[in-house]
């Protein structure tokens, strides 16, 4: 994670989607027979983008997403923002699963996970690079709960600048099927150290839960939410460094 102040240096660090760097990961996914999500500084004009690409277990590229909510108050003011949120079907051992992605600061906005849910996402992948503490982890739990989606977050480990590990996965199933009460949606929370952590999403149970519970898109009233798409901002939310 490195965004130099010098634009020439920044562009020199960026790599294309179809270049040698990404080809190495594509071949690795194909060789190991696993899906791989890769984050990278993508070559783009006028400025590079913070991008994640998902390869399936055959090495086929199935999803590209560039971070929509760039941190314009920090060093990401030197990056281009992405245009939209995307989903894709991924072949897994449990059959086809619809995957969406959002990157780090995107999770601060409920709209990010919401639009992915509306586009059919069942599991949302969240590459992350910041301290994961109770408030940010609670955000992810809430995104899973309110959209009835799985959320899998991968954070840089302790030792990287401003990072502390604590990657998490939530399945979004907040209530037991037998009506006996609520349950903890957390599948796993990693420690601070780098490692391989396995999260087993009960996809059939998640789908059944979505068919019967009241969250997600079941009872929304989008006709009442017109102000959500207004571009007007008023105090106290005016920020001079906010880009369009």
Question: Where do the protein language model's features map onto the residues?
Answer:
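C-terminal beta-strand edge segments of enzyme domains
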Residues: 157-244
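CN hydrolase (nitrilase-like) catalytic-core segments centered on the catalytic cysteine
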Residues: 14-37, 107-197
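RNA-binding accessory domains that recognize and position tRNA/RNA substrates
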Residues: 36, 88-91, 145, 219, ...
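Alpha-helix boundary/capping residues
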Residues: 68, 128, 147, 213-216, ...
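Generic secondary-structure signature for well-ordered alpha-helical cores
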Residues: 30, 57-60, 67, 204, ...
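Short, conserved active-site loops that position catalytic residues or coordinate cofactors/metal ions
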Residues: 1-12
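Glycine-rich, histidine-containing beta strand-loop boundary motifs that form or position
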Residues: 40
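Active-site catalytic loop in hydrolytic enzyme cores
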Residues: 23, 43-119, 127-128, 132-142, ...
């Amino acid at each position: 994670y490195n965004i130099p102040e010098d634009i020439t240096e920044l562009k020199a660090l960026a790599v294309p989607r179809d270049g040698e760097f990404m080809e190495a990961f594509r071949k690795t996914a194909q060789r190991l027979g696993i899906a791989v999500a890769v984050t990278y500084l993508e070559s783009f004009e006028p400025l590079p983008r913070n991008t994640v690409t998902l390869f399936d277990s055959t090495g086929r590229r199935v999803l590209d997403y560039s971070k929509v909510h760039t941190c314009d108050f920090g060093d990401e003011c030197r990056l281009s923002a992405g245009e939209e949120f995307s989903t894709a079907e991924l072949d897994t051992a449990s059959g086809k699963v619809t995957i969406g992605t959002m990157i780090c600061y995107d999770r601060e906005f409920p709209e990010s996970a919401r639009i992915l849910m509306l586009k059919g996402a069942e599991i949302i992948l969240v590459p992350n690079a910041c301290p994961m503490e109770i408030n940010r982890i609670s955000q992810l739990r809430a995104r899973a709960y309110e959209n009835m989606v799985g959320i899998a977050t991968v954070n840089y480990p302790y030792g990287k600048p401003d990072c502390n590990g604590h990657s998490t996965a939530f399945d979004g199933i907040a209530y037991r099927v037998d009506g006996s009460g609520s349950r903890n949606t957390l599948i796993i929370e990693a420690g601070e150290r780098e490692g391989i952590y396995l999260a087993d999403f009960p996809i059939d149970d998640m789908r059944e839960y979505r068919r019967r519970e009241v969250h997600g898109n079941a009872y929304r009233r989008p006709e009442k939410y017109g102000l959500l798409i207004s571009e007007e901002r008023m105090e106290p939310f005016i920020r001079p460094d906010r880009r369009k």
